A protein has these predicted regions:
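Active-site nucleotide/adenylate-binding loops and adjacent lid/helix of ATP-dependent enzymes
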Residues: 4-5, 100-181, 211, 235-251
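Solvent-exposed alpha-helices and their adjacent loops that cap or buttress functional pockets
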Residues: 21, 36-38, 90, 112-114, ...
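Peripheral (often C-terminal) accessory segments that flank ATP-dependent C-N-forming ligase machineries
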Residues: 310-420
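Short, charged, surface-exposed secondary-structure boundary motifs
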Residues: 38-41, 55, 98-104, 217-218
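Internal nucleotide-binding/catalytic subdomain
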Residues: 156-293
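Active-site "cap" helix and flanking loop/linker of ATP-utilizing ligase/carboxylase catalytic domains
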Residues: 246-268, 285-355
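ATP-binding N-terminal substructure of ATP-dependent carboxylate-amine bond-forming enzymes
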Residues: 1-94
Length: 420
């Protein structure tokens, strides 16, 4: 079958790469894709927002399945437009994508269906939010309601820090409309893990658990980012805890979505806190994580195209999804100044080719002449593969020694929690 991937980041590079080696897939298109994705997909210069052009292209080229990578097109309703045109889509409807598009929607739904998460309040006014903060005390978590590229969360260790975050968001300075409503949550103690799942509207098949590293600096210091590295499988989510998360979080949420008249199709991403009381939801995302995708997909031992088509057509079964008995680690190389600002146009030197045991996924690069240059933010995701996590990490960091660009920054402690 022919598959089209929407997006151009590291996650989409990983999706296109994995689909291109799936037995059921004969052709991969990427809209718009990135220069490096031409190695595994045909790039198509169409804007997904021009739905008439997009649908014409998909029909003329007899594309069987569309895989939507980023959250913005999903929250904007791209899946609805394509489904209406009779094109199968791996990705949720606009209504279902509210799980990520609105923190308030997600929290209210979890409360209604008794899905374990942190206690919370919802606020539109600064003074009311500050009163809640004063009553609750710190540490406390302040979240912008809408999409903020993974940066709309402040874990405030003091009341002053929480108050400043509320003022920043509700004034509209930080995230515009996305921050016009805030969710304030109790601080949950524990270790975080990401559990993604394939979903076809009813059936939920969990993927291998991974762990992201959100903070920019070693030791989980500095501001939040879109993610500075991941590894899988994550030992913090034992088989027993994974089953518990499936039974108490993922399956109930998918059942709730169906009951609410917005069945969920695609990848459901549960960001979890593993507390003393068991797994609780930190957040839901309506798509593959970035950079979780870069470690989860290399460990898949099944046909990704077949799985995604089954999700899109309501025919998913657990036996379609098998995993390799090995490990993967991804270290993000970010540009100078990230996440506050980010440098662009710096030449990337060294070896960024693909090998059997290391893969380099491009998050933010451009091809200028013969050279790849940085294009801001997270630049590359260097993935190491191995029989165990130590081997995978050694391969990823070993590979980084042969890559360089001006102001390159990365964490040296990805995966450290797995060895505690």
């Amino acid at each position: 079958m022919k598959v089209c991937v929407i997006g151009n980041g590291g996650r989409e590079h990983a999706l296109a790469w994995r689909l291109s080696i799936s037995p059921s897939v004969t052709k991969v298109y990427a809209i718009p894709g990135s220069a490096v994705m031409s190695d595994c997909a045909e790039l198509v210069g169409i804007d997904w927002q021009q739905s008439d052009h997009l649908i014409s292209f998909l029909k003329e080229n007899q594309v069987d399945l569309v895989v939507v990578g980023p959250e913005a097109p999903l929250v904007a309703g791209l899946a609805d437009v394509l489904n209406k045109a009779g094109i199968p889509v791996f990705g949720p409807s606009k209504a279902a994508a509210q799980l990520e598009g609105s923190k308030v929607f997600a929290k209210d739904l979890m409360k209604k269906y008794n899905i374990p998460t942190a206690a919370y309040g919802v606020f539109h006014k600064v003074d009311e939010a500050k009163t809640f903060i004063a009553q609750t005390g710190a540490p406390i978590v302040v979240k912008a309601d809408g999409l903020a590229a993974g940066k709309g969360v402040v874990v405030a260790m003091t009341v002053d820090e929480a108050n400043a975050a509320v003022e920043d968001m509700l004034s509209g300075n930080r995230f515009g409309d996305a921050g016009s409503t805030v969710v304030i949550e109790e601080f949950m103690e524990g270790e975080e893990a990401s559990l993604l799942a394939f979903v076809d509207g009813k059936t939920v098949v969990p993927m291998i658990a991974s762990q992201d590293h959100k903070r920019i600096f070693d030791g989980d210091k500095g501001p939040n980012t879109g993610g500075m590295g991941t590894y899988a499988p994550a030992p913090v989510l034992t088989d027993a805890l994974r089953d518990e998360a499936l039974k108490t979080i993922l399956e109930p949420m998918v059942a709730a979505m169906e009951k609410e008249g917005m069945p969920y199709v695609g990848c459901l991403y549960a960001g979890l806190m593993i507390t003393d009381e068991g797994p609780k939801v930190v957040e839901f995302n309506a798509r593959f994580g970035d950079p979780e995708t870069q470690v989860v997909l290399p460990l898949l031992d099944s046909d990704l195209g077949q799985i995604m088509m089954a999700c899109a057509t309501g025919t998913l079964t657990a036996d379609m999804v098998k995993w390799k008995d090995s490990s993967a680690a991804c270290v993000i190389l970010a540009s100078k100044g990230y996440p506050e600002t980010s440098s662009k146009g710096d030449v990337i030197s060294g070896d960024i080719k693909q090998y059997d045991t290391t893969i380099v996924f491009h998050s933010g690069t451009r091809l200028v002449g013969e050279n790849y240059v940085t294009n801001g933010g997270r630049v590359l995701g260097v993935v190491g593969l191995g029989k165990d996590l130590r081997t995978a990490l050694d391969r990823a960091y070993g590979r980084i020694e042969h890559i360089d660009f001006e102001g390159m920054q990365y964490r040296t402690d990805i995966g450290a929690k797995a060895f505690k």
